[in-house]
Amino acid sequence: MPAAIRRPPRSLYCGQVRPAHIGQTVTLYGWIDRRRDHGGVIFLDLRDRSGIVQLVADPQKTPLSYELAGQVRSEYVVRVTGTVHQRPSDSFNPRLATGEVEVYAEELEILSRVGKQLPFSVSGEEGEEVREEIRLRYRYLDLRRERLSRNLQLRHQVIKAIRRFLEDEEGFIEVETPILTRSTPEGARDYLVPSRVNPGEWFALPQSPQLFKQLLMVAGVDRYYQIARCFRDEDLRADRQPEFTQLDMEMSFMDQEAILELNERLLCHIFKTVKGIDLPRPFPRLTYAEAMARYGSDKPDTRFGLELVDVSPLFQGSGFKVFAKALQEGGVIKVLPVPGGDEKISNTRIKPGGDLFKLVTQYGAGGLAFIRVRPGSLDTIGALKESLSPEQEQQLLQLTNAKPGDLLLFGAGPAAVVNESLGRLRLHLGQELGLIPENALNLLWITDFPLFEFNAEENRLEALHHPFTAPHPDDLADLKTARAQAYDLVWNGVEVGGGSLRIYQREIQEQVFQTIGLTPEQARDKFGFLLEAFEYGTPPHGGIAYGLDRLVMLLAGEDSIRDVIAFPKTQQARCLLTGAPSGVEAKQLKELHVASTYQPG
């Protein structure tokens, strides 16, 4: 057999070459980013994950490599050995970390060629816009590009910072929980896996490690974390994937204050380590009720104002029928004051058929009433104008802090509908009017969520977070209206994490199961192992989980989590690279005792 080829080891990554290496001989490996022929001297940009360095092939100084340099093309894989030189001062490139140096290619070896036309340019300087479908189909090429390569490295840095903080400073241990488990109702549909050795029975892929991490607390692990893979079979949006990654944590003998304080220090450590940003502590807090009242959302973007104002008392017994009807039916009247909106927003946009009308009706509102604040008067439709006395007009201006030139937009109806529609309108106008400062960074906690919400389709209560969340101790007398000891972390209007103190007493857990409609038999069948564990000495405990993909997305300044995941699925839950999901052979289905009833077309 021929002897194995021995190549010199890499001495540096391309992006690490600096003026300190001038005069040294280095060996580099990477991809050709660009090739330029300038009057007989060939310049090559060599790229790896660390960056780009310029190579020089000169027929006078490096004759052995010059001929090969003429053959290389973009994305050829090469090895180069050569001496580091300082670039002429007039050819410094301030855009590159290596822009003051170049490597004279004394040896050049082509390791791999490109055998067909590239589907798109990998070079970052081409400025080529590539459809996402093409990028996902050739993801291995897309990941060579500077932006995605940087995002993957940022993701690694975030995970490394998490591990160092939790393990080295806080005494957490990383424990892997099962991927093949049993199906339990947690909201979204499970991905099911048939068991070949137990015909007719199924595993489910975990939507979260929730139950196992609670059992780890029963087991005395005390402080657990995991970079956990989770799976949910749900309709996808820009910020959702069928498989995703969580930073999952659980802690014994810690109350809510201690958990929030520890997590603030964790977030501060991450931001300082990967972005060099010092976050102020403590983070602001809003209760769920405050967030809904002021922003119409349980994940408010607090970088700008435009807060909602409840003016329901002002319109009690109003002669304006729309408002009177809403209040008689137990609803609310709220105002979204828009400073300077009188000139910026036309009546056409507010009335039926207008874009703002369509926006609020999309979320259940019947429409928008409005008042334009003019010097010395309020301008609106006759019926609303006539329903307001001069004293009420003044009270309205005081409540909303409105000035001449402002626009008041009204929502009337059930509180949930008014909050949702005006909250969405607030975000839309905040962006449209340029009220959101780009570089602002607002993190806050939302606390005191309701324990349950009503599911109108199924005519029953269901857990707002999950049925293992502990009720507030002051609300145990009536669980149906209880507050939850739950908390969400919101960053610029995006929920990046959420958690709670957990139920650790069997009798309370059984009451919660009963409240969401599980019979004792159903509770034992689905969660008997958890209920039994609570009989053997369970510590008070709580935890939190962060959407790691979403956290990295925000740190990277991206708009979609697909741009911070190496091999994401499309919004149709497909992998365009491998063709998954795909059909399987009849033999495989037979072994699993499974038959497909799907009929194409």
UniProtKB/Swiss-Prot annotation:
Example of a GO biological process term: aspartyl-tRNA aminoacylation
Residues flagged as site, Important for tRNA non-discrimination: H38
Single GO MF annotation: ATP binding
Protein name listed in UniProt: Aspartate--tRNA(Asp/Asn) ligase
Binding site for ATP: R232, D233, E234, Q241, E495, G547, L548, D549, R550
Protein's cellular compartments: Cytoplasm
Coiled coil: none
Pfam families noted in UniProt: GAD, tRNA-synt_2, tRNA_anti-codon
Domain of life (superkingdom): Bacteria
Family: Belongs to the class-II aminoacyl-tRNA synthetase family. Type 1 subfamily.
Catalytic activity: tRNA(Asx) + L-aspartate + ATP = L-aspartyl-tRNA(Asx) + AMP + diphosphate
Region spans: Aspartate: 210-213
Function: Aspartyl-tRNA synthetase with relaxed tRNA specificity since it is able to aspartylate not only its cognate tRNA(Asp) but also tRNA(Asn). Reaction proceeds in two steps: L-aspartate is first activated by ATP to form Asp-AMP and then transferred to the acceptor end of tRNA(Asp/Asn).
Residues annotated for L-aspartate binding in this entry: E186, R232, H465, R502
One term under GO cellular component: cytoplasm
Keywords, sorted A to Z: Aminoacyl-tRNA synthetase, ATP-binding, Cytoplasm, Ligase, Nucleotide-binding, Protein biosynthesis
InterPro entries the record matches: Aa-tRNA-synt_II, aa-tRNA-synth_II, aa-tRNA-synth_II/BPL/LPL, Asp-tRNA-ligase_1, Asp-tRNA-ligase_1_N, Asp/Asn-tRNA-synth_IIb, AspRS_core, GAD-like_sf
